[in-house]
Structure formats: structure tokens, C-alpha cells
Amino acid sequence: MSWQQAAGYGAGDAMARRAPSVVVAGGGTAGHIEPALALADAVRRLRPDARVTALGTERGLENRLVPARGYPLELVPPVPMPRKPTPELLKLPLKVRESVKRTREVLDRVGADVVVGFGGYVSLPAYLAARGKTPIVVHEANARAGLANKVGAKFAERVLSATPDSGLAGARTIGIPLRESITTLDRAALRAQARAHFGLHPHAPTILVFGGSQGARTLNTAFSGAADALGRAGVGVLHAHGPKNTLAVQQVPGAPVYNAVPYLERMDLAYAAADLVVCRSGAMTVAEVSAVGLPAVFVPLPHGNGEQALNAQPVVSAGGARLVPDEQMTPQRVVEELLPLALDAQRLQEMSRATLSTGHREADRVLAQIVLEVAGR
């Protein structure tokens, strides 16, 4: 008699109690990595015994972000897909074969029960390596699905998306998995602490400005050019200009502080300190702003295939945000449109409710439950 039988467990019970092994593939950019890590955290909350392994490349941000969150990182060769026909296309089959082989070795070594892909350079080899051997779950964060996820969706057990119009057939819309510090954020309760943390006026209307991890020149120019008018109107600003940029702002005597910083480590406090946010509309940013119910002015990145404008559309349509094209974001636009908005408390309150109505605070838990279900654990 086996120990399982002696203890009253059947074979199925023993399998169900084995620690699940989840492999997440979402390296390259923060937009791919952060949802993967949010899922990893949610899986651990549901199954503390779970083993979560992240796939990445040697040059991606995951080399810093994944170890910092306490998860093992396995490096595989990236498979960048050229947007246009180039000589690099001739090398693609060899690169794909090498990366798939290395990825399969990782999946075997960790005993993967499920592979969860979020798009990006490491997702394609992960999907191909797992195909027919390890169940696949695909999550698409952008309003327009990328090539890797289009491929993975063809043989995935489950396909999830942030928005209904991702282009992936049969996808279930659940939003984007976010950090618990964002999904549980109570802006009103943290407001005083957040204002003190950043040295902001405790009561003045405050605008949060940021352009992603590297900042945005358009936003930097527009707001630094309007700093004097903002200060004289009694509006404070918390502005993350990017670590590679500098921002010279003359403080208006007696006015609320214009706090220009290279980078924001505590986005939860930044959101809590603000009454209005002006930012790009990457998928993660839109998801976070929606989850915390912060009125927004989105300035989509003017490059790519227009996905940033599409990401923002659900919030704009609901009345929780405005959309300003990059080329139209000027100091004059800030003074004539954004300044009056920052001073209109009633309008901001209405926008906050509308923004919150589009958010998905439970996406991390929902995705974690789906992943564990597919893994059979």
C-alpha cells in the first residue's frame, strides 16, 4: 500500500496536492513584465507552495525586475520579429530553432505544468516549445494583439485580453493583472501621506505628469513651459521627467510646489497624491489609472501602429479621460484646457467615477485562478 493510500488519498488527490510549476513569459519591456509578475504574486497568494519561473532575455528589464520580486529567471535567446523585410529575416528560422530548444530544456527542468505568455520576444519561443506538451495560457494587454500572441492563441488552452477588441478570436476580457499595491489602493486614505512624501501642498489641486520609465519630451516641454501659469493659479505638479532628462522649473513664490523628479519609485503614492494625471497611454498605464479611478489626460505615443490611442479609448468613451495628440500637447494647451480642468473639482469627481467604472481590479486573481485550473492544480 502506498503512503497516499495509507493516508486516505487517491492518486488524483496526490496529484492535486503537488506544488504547481508555472512558467511566465513576458520579457523585454515593463509592459510585458509587470503583468507577468502581478500574476506570479497572485498565484503565490492562492497557492503559497507554487513554483513560478520567469523566462527572459539577457538584455531585457526582467534582469532587474524579476529577481527584485523574488522569482527565478531563466534566460533564453530572444526572437525579435522584424517589422519590415530585412536580411535579418533569413536568420530567423535558425534563431527560432535555437530559442525553442533552449526554452524546452527550461520547461522540462522545472517540470512546467503551464506556460503563461504575455507577448514580447520570449513569448513566441515559449509557445512553440510548449506546443503539444505543456498547456498554454495567452494574455494580451494591448488593444491590438502582437504577432507572438496571435501565434500562441492558435494552440492555447485559454486566451485572455485586456480589452474586447484585441483581435484574438474567443478571448475572454479580464483586464490586466496589476500589482497589489495598485489594486488595493485607497487614494483618499493615502492622500495626506502621499502629499507629504513628495513635499506637495496638502490641499492644492495637483497634477501628476509622467511619460513612462524614460519620460516624454513632449510632456516635459509642455508642462515646464506652463509652470508659471500653473503655480500662479494655485495648482501643484508632481512631474517625473525621466532619468535621462533634466527639467529646469522656476518655482513661483508662495505657490504650490512644482516637484520635478527623474523617476517615481512609489507609483501608488503618486496616484494617491494626484487629482489629475497627464501621461502616455500604454496598456499598463491605462489599466493602473483605471483601477485607481484617477481622471486622466492621455497623450498617446505617436509611433507604432496606433495601439496607444486604442488602449485609451474605453476610458475616453466612458468620460473618464481626454485624449490629446502628441503634436497638440503644448504649453498653451496645458494653460487653456488642462489648468481649468485641474481646478474643476466637480468635473474631476465625475471623471473619477467614470474612470473607475472601466477598471479591472480583480484581473490578477482571475487570471491566477484560470492558470491553476489549466495546470490541473
From Swiss-Prot:
User: Where is this chain's protein located in or outside the cell?
Assistant: Cell membrane
The reaction(s) annotated as catalysed by this protein in its Swiss-Prot or TrEMBL entry are: di-trans,octa-cis-undecaprenyl diphospho-N-acetyl-alpha-D-muramoyl-L-alanyl-D-glutamyl-meso-2,6-diaminopimeloyl-D-alanyl-D-alanine + UDP-N-acetyl-alpha-D-glucosamine = di-trans,octa-cis-undecaprenyl diphospho-[N-acetyl-alpha-D-glucosaminyl-(1->4)]-N-acetyl-alpha-D-muramoyl-L-alanyl-D-glutamyl-meso-2,6-diaminopimeloyl-D-alanyl-D-alanine + UDP + H(+)
User: Which UniProt keywords are present, listed alphabetically?
Assistant: Cell cycle, Cell division, Cell membrane, Cell shape, Cell wall biogenesis/degradation, Glycosyltransferase, Membrane, Peptidoglycan synthesis, Transferase
Query: Do you know which InterPro entries this protein is assigned to?
Result: GlcNAc_MurG, Glyco_trans_28_C, GlycoTrans_28_N
In terms of one coarse class, where is the protein primarily found?
membrane
Topology in the lipid bilayer:
Peripheral membrane protein
Instruction: State a single Pfam family of this protein.
Output: Glyco_tran_28_C
Give a GO biological-process term. Answer: regulation of cell shape
* EC numbers on record: 2.4.1.227
- Is this entry keyworded Membrane? yes
The pathway is: Cell wall biogenesis; peptidoglycan biosynthesis
The entry lists its GO molecular-function terms as: UDP-N-acetyl-D-glucosamine:N-acetylmuramoyl-L-alanyl-D-glutamyl-meso-2,6-diaminopimelyl-D-alanyl-D-alanine-diphosphoundecaprenol 4-beta-N-acetylglucosaminlytransferase activity; undecaprenyldiphospho-muramoylpentapeptide beta-N-acetylglucosaminyltransferase activity
- The answer to keyword Aminoacyl-tRNA synthetase applying to this record is no
The UniProt record gives the binding positions of UDP-N-acetyl-alpha-D-glucosamine as 29-31, 142, 179, 213, 308
Q: Gene Ontology terms, cellular component aspect?
A: plasma membrane
Return the similarity comment.
Answer: Belongs to the glycosyltransferase 28 family. MurG subfamily.
**HAMAP family referenced in this protein's UniProt entry, alphabetically:** MurG
Q: What does this protein do?
A: Cell wall formation. Catalyzes the transfer of a GlcNAc subunit on undecaprenyl-pyrophosphoryl-MurNAc-pentapeptide (lipid intermediate I) to form undecaprenyl-pyrophosphoryl-MurNAc-(pentapeptide)GlcNAc (lipid intermediate II).
- Protein name, per record: UDP-N-acetylglucosamine--N-acetylmuramyl-(pentapeptide) pyrophosphoryl-undecaprenol N-acetylglucosamine transferase
Query: From what organism does this protein derive?
Result: Saccharopolyspora erythraea (strain ATCC 11635 / DSM 40517 / JCM 4748 / NBRC 13426 / NCIMB 8594 / NRRL 2338)
Taxonomic path: Bacteria, Bacillati, Actinomycetota, Actinomycetes, Pseudonocardiales
